[in-house]
């Protein structure tokens, strides 16, 4: 999975897909009551990027629904995963449950259309800190109460704050979640980061019987050398401001026979098993 980073305005969706992304990450800004208002990152953000571009969240969902709905004039078959970077660290943890309710409701109304010609992409809920775990409860409770638990099959969970992997596992156990789990590791592109935690996450992913990590990705990579380093370690995905650089690296002799771009036929919740 090549995840385009910080794809917040409409016009950047096609821009990043044209550069080779098959997934996009966008930021969700909440008001003080946990209501999702805008796709917006804000200052500071990655070096070389404009931090302030935004869209109304519901309008953005309407747009990406079209991009991920076969038969729609805007349809792009390559876009198979939407990563929602939930800016919960900007609001009180007491509002995390309400935020989960609101995001689930807006996905039902504007993306899935409650079963009427909704978008098909997989959804990854990127939660910054384990203290915000109530978001997941609010989200799942809403799908159940609204009679649309079938969408759980499309939804995955990812804690993105580089916290202790065992602490993340404990929270997932507490929630009763042991599938559809991604693990991110990374830092803003402005800084360098070692691979210790990334390697630990990959080791857990590859441990037989370990349920709490099915995919691992590195973020936010802009240098080809760091992309190569991550691929050599065996990541499932890369988040980048420059998807075209990732595509170019994947075509190199070292990687061309080991990796390919994920398609809609690839289940993002299953561990990859080499043939």
UniProtKB/Swiss-Prot annotation:
Tell me its EC number(s), please: 4.6.1.-
Please tell me where this protein is predominantly located: secreted
Give the positions the UniProt entry annotates as the active site. 5, 41
- Its top-level enzyme class, in one word, is lyase
Any one GO MF annotation of this record: metal ion binding
What cellular component GO annotations does this protein have?
extracellular region
Q: Which UniProt keywords apply?
A: Cytolysis, Dermonecrotic toxin, Disulfide bond, Hemolysis, Lipid degradation, Lipid metabolism, Lyase, Magnesium, Metal-binding, Secreted, Toxin
Q: What's the cofactor?
A: Mg(2+)
Q: Which Gene3D superfamilies does the entry mention?
A: Phosphatidylinositol (PI) phosphodiesterase (3.20.20.190)
State the InterPro entries in the record: PLC-like_Pdiesterase_TIM-brl
Similarity comment text for this entry: Belongs to the arthropod phospholipase D family. Class II subfamily.
- What name has this protein been given in UniProt? Dermonecrotic toxin SpaSicTox-betaIIA1
Species assigned in the record:
Sicarius patagonicus
